[in-house]
Amino acid sequence: MKKTIKLAVVAALALGATSAFATNGSVMVGTGAKALGMAGTGIGMSHGSESALVNPALITSIENSEISFGGTFFMPDVSFDNGMGAGPADSDADLSVVPMVAVATKISENVYIGVGMWGTAGMGTDYRDSAANFAMVTNLQLMQFGVPVAYKVAGFSAAITPLLQYGSLDINFNPGTGNVGSGVAQDLEFGYSIGLSYEISAFTVGAVYKSQIDMDYKDQLSTAGAAFGLTLGNELSTPAELGLGVSYAFGANTVALDYKQIKWTDAKGYKDFKWDDQDVISLGYEYATKSWAARLGYNYASSPISDQGIANTAINTMNLLGFPAIVESHYALGGTYNFSEQTSFDVAYVYSPEAEETYIASNYPNQGTRETTTKHSQSALSVAVNFNF
């Protein structure tokens, strides 16, 4: 059964190698075109069936049934300067595509159910043509399947979503002494999310908890770490998240504010790389008419990685060269056009301005240390088609 599911997910991911998302750390800023158009905001504001991906309690806003499917084109721009005088090298991991499908239906006066598949996280670089950067290629991909079940009474909704997560990780490089790497490793594990929402007058408040999911990628981190003199396990957990959100609707306008914490310090693997917890703030605005809607948003979280100093130069190298999660600000705009009462089209664009970090890093054991610099910016274009029936 696991092999069958893995094959299905690999087929979906074949649309594009997901090597870098518009991200807080390695977690997507948002999932779905409506949420992305508001920079990920959606814990306290319903986006229809798409809410299954953000706060499953809010799928109770649909009238009958709704299906949304689409995808996001991610275009990261990453470079690394190893401090040896040759100048920066650009990562070739500059385009990826992730599909998204979300379905929700009202099955009784109080009970709603859905199903969805969506990419949730990813990060990586591709320096295979840069020997000075060890020809390093890293690629983390995560995708989830979920079945949200929600119950609504009066203005209160509660939901739980059992999750099945597929993950793949590939780390390979050549430090000049031969290839290091074990090919792509995959895993399939379970988790869950819990959502709550309450509507009172023009306000909606929401809360969501997403469980940590422990993933094990055979021989990936241990093999890569050993080459840098590090002793690492092969677990790389998807971190737990806790979020709160509120929205206020007045006329055609809605303003929404979300806060969530991403628990990197408790996540296996990320603890070894010294990642810090992130406090994420998202602010979104929507103007909606019967035929169209426009959205704006801003998302901010400080980088989870930091300079670990001269005692941890190998960790600095792995973070900056392989997993440069340094982007902090995200600006978004989006919209919806309603072709009819049954059919609509969503679009969103997210831009993350360039961030730059310089750490003391090690090229390889016994080769000394030097200052290395990574620059990273991101842009993403998301589209979706929605059907109500």
Where are these regions (language model features)?
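Outer-membrane beta-barrel pore proteins
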Residues: 43-45, 52-65, 103-107
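Short hydrophobic "helix-edge" motifs at membrane interfaces and signal-peptide entry regions
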Residues: 44-47, 331
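Residue-level detector of alpha-helical secondary structure
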Residues: 37, 51-58, 68, 384
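Gram-negative bacterial Sec-dependent N-terminal signal peptides
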Residues: 1-22
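Transmembrane beta-strand segments of Gram-negative outer membrane beta-barrel proteins
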Residues: 27-42, 60-77
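Outer-membrane beta-barrel porins/channels
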Residues: 23-36, 81-89, 95-389
